């Protein structure tokens, strides 16, 4: 069970927790794949993108998968496109890739081509928690900029102001306990005062190892069925309330 008396902050995963997995895999990823070439070919983007592209080149040079496109040492940004598209298809969590994806999504969100379809229970739960004085944060493999776009353009309007902190894999891998130790330290809270909600057993295990409270998210369409070994698993964030609601196990 959740220790609500000691709880001070709730940190949420995104995919499979606050929105359907198929929005990410079926809408966001294809949009980025389609528009990366345009981003890479824009002259006014060359200087801002250079640090990210340099990181991608290093990752490509040291890529150990035989299925990856053959390495090219060309300095033409478009030479990176086959590798970037391959990374998207593999759902790699490479930080510079995630930042590049976020840049393509910015245009999509601002143009109205993309709108985040949150689960219906998410916005009411976030607002209720904030009203109770709980601090809210996001920890996702998507870049911080992409997270802010995600919550700034939802089916329930702009919810970005509800969140105090945003964390991506620049903090550290989501499957490593040290990342959650750093997260709690950044919030300036004891680990037990932080609740992490995710649909991934690897992430839940890492957060639990760091001393955080955890809650599994079991949504329709999630690729993983969470084990009953987790202390709390819910199918709706509305099931989480200090008053001891039904639906916890």
From Swiss-Prot:
Gene3D superfamilies, A to Z: 1.10.720.60, HAD superfamily/HAD-like (3.40.50.1000)
Main EC class the enzyme belongs to: hydrolase
Pfam families: Hydrolase
Annotated EC: 3.1.3.77
Stored InterPro entries: Enolase-ppase_E1, HAD-like_sf, HAD_sf
Record pathway: Amino-acid biosynthesis; L-methionine biosynthesis via salvage pathway; L-methionine from S-methyl-5-thio-alpha-D-ribose 1-phosphate: step 3/6; Amino-acid biosynthesis; L-methionine biosynthesis via salvage pathway; L-methionine from S-methyl-5-thio-alpha-D-ribose 1-phosphate: step 4/6
Record field: catalytic activity: 5-methylsulfanyl-2,3-dioxopentyl phosphate + H2O = 1,2-dihydroxy-5-(methylsulfanyl)pent-1-en-3-one + phosphate
Alphabetic keyword roster: Amino-acid biosynthesis, Hydrolase, Magnesium, Metal-binding, Methionine biosynthesis
GO terms for MF: 2,3-diketo-5-methylthiopentyl-1-phosphate enolase activity; 2-hydroxy-3-keto-5-methylthiopentenyl-1-phosphate phosphatase activity; acireductone synthase activity; magnesium ion binding
Cofactor note: Binds 1 Mg(2+) ion per subunit.
GO annotation, biological process: L-methionine salvage from methylthioadenosine
Cofactor(s) of this protein: Mg(2+)
PANTHER family named in the record: ENOLASE-PHOSPHATASE E1
Record text on subunit structure and interactions: Monomer.
Known role: Bifunctional enzyme that catalyzes the enolization of 2,3-diketo-5-methylthiopentyl-1-phosphate (DK-MTP-1-P) into the intermediate 2-hydroxy-3-keto-5-methylthiopentenyl-1-phosphate (HK-MTPenyl-1-P), which is then dephosphorylated to form the acireductone 1,2-dihydroxy-3-keto-5-methylthiopentene (DHK-MTPene).
Family: Belongs to the HAD-like hydrolase superfamily. MasA/MtnC family.
Protein name: Enolase-phosphatase E1
Species this protein is from: Synechococcus sp. (strain RCC307)
């Amino acid at each position: 069970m959740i220790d609500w008396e000691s709880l001070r902050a709730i940190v949420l995963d995104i995919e499979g927790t606050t929105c359907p997995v198929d929005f990410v895999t079926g809408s966001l990823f294809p949009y980025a794949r389609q528009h990366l070439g345009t981003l890479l070919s824009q002259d006014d983007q060359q200087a801002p993108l250079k640090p990210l592209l340099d990181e991608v080149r290093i990752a490509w040079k040291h890529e150990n998968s035989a299925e990856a496109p053959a390495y090219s040492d060309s300095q033409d940004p478009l030479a990176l496109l086959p590798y970037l598209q391959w990374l998207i298809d593999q759902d790699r969590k490479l930080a510079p890739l995630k930042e590049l994806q976020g840049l393509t999504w910015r245009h999509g969100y601002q143009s109205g081509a993309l709108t985040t379809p949150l689960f219906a229970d998410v916005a009411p739960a976030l607002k209720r928690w904030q009203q109770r004085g709980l601090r809210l944060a996001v920890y996702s493999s998507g870049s911080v900029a992409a997270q802010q776009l995600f919550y700034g353009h939802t089916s329930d309007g702009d919810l970005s102001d509800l969140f105090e902190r945003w964390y991506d894999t620049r903090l550290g891998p989501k499957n490593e306990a040290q990342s959650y130790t750093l997260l709690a330290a950044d919030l300036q809270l004891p680990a037990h005062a932080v609740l992490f909600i995710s649909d991934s057993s690897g992430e839940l295990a890492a957060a639990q190892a760091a001393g955080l409270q955890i809650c599994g998210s079991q949504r329709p369409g999630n690729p993983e069925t969470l084990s009953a070994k987790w202390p709390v698993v819910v199918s709706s964030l509305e099931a989480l309330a200090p008053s001891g609601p039904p639906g916890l196990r």
